[in-house]
Amino acid sequence: MSHTIRDKQKLKARTSKIQGQVIALKKMLDEPHECAAVLQQIAAIRGAVNGLMREVIKGHLTEHIVHQSDEARREEDLDVILKVLDSYIK
């Protein structure tokens, strides 16, 4: 079973939190708010997205790299995660 399926409830809870934070940000932009409050909300969203990314990467590394017995498949999976990390860090 894929780690994203096994951890589905936890990951969905994180995405719901992110969704709520984005909705709150949109509401903040519709009404007058201090720039600092808007920036704080954006930082909170970024932190939540980073947390989600960390959990999915951790699951991927554990399942597809550490516990992968097929060396060729492990190399393929490593290439995939490295490309994702490159695009995420840009």
UniProtKB/Swiss-Prot annotation:
The gene is rcnR. It is found in: Cytoplasm. It comes from the Bacteria. PANTHER family: TRANSCRIPTIONAL REPRESSOR FRMR-RELATED (PTHR33677), TRANSCRIPTIONAL REPRESSOR RCNR (PTHR33677:SF1). CDD domains: RcnR-FrmR-like_DUF156. GO terms for cellular component: cytoplasm; protein-DNA complex. The keyword Transcription regulation applies. This is Transcriptional repressor RcnR. Its main location: cytoplasm. NCBIfam families: PRK15039.1. Gene3D superfamilies: Metal-sensitive repressor, helix protomer (1.20.58.1000). Belongs to the FrmR/RcnR family. GO terms for biological process: negative regulation of DNA-templated transcription. GO terms for molecular function: DNA-binding transcription repressor activity; metal ion binding; transcription cis-regulatory region binding. Keywords: Cytoplasm, DNA-binding, Repressor, Transcription, Transcription regulation. Repressor of rcnA expression. Acts by binding specifically to the rcnA promoter in the absence of nickel and cobalt. In the presence of one of these metals, it has a weaker affinity for rcnA promoter.
